[in-house]
Every structure is written in structure tokens, then in C-alpha cells.
Amino acid sequence: MKASELREKSVEELNAELLGLLREQFNLRMQHATGQLTQTNQLKLVRRNIARVKTIITSKAGV
């Protein structure tokens, strides 16, 4: 997901996206802990996407 795509969304849509990403991160962490996760780079990608969404939410709140 690109930052330019996220900037076009409303704050409500971004909050929904953030909630979905946090759930995905939780599921990936559980899979990693039980040894079921084969693509460990997914954790890094989701964490960065969460940071992108939070950054854009903060920038929209400041405007």
C-alpha cells in the first residue's frame, strides 16, 4: 500500500485500515510464535504499513 493511496482516504477509512492491520499483525505474531509463519518478512511489511497509516492520520489531524 502506497502513502499516496492512503492520503486519498478519509480519517474514518484510515482508522478502519489501521484496525485491520493491527489484527493482521497479531495473527502474524501468533503464527510466528507457533512456528507456522514461513514468510517472516510479512511482519516487517505490516509494521511499516501501520506506521504509514498512523503518520497520515496524525498529519490529517494536524490540518
Swiss-Prot record:
GO terms for cellular component: cytosolic large ribosomal subunit. Pfam families: Ribosomal_L29. GO terms for molecular function: structural constituent of ribosome. SUPFAM superfamilies: Ribosomal protein L29 (L29p) (SSF46561). Keywords: Ribonucleoprotein, Ribosomal protein. GO terms for biological process: translation. InterPro entries: Ribosomal_protein_uL29, Ribosomal_uL29, Ribosomal_uL29_CS, Ribosomal_uL29_sf. Gene3D superfamilies: 1.10.287.310. Belongs to the universal ribosomal protein uL29 family. NCBIfam families: L29 (TIGR00012). This is Large ribosomal subunit protein uL29. The lineage of its organism: Bacteria, Pseudomonadati, Pseudomonadota, Gammaproteobacteria, Alteromonadales.
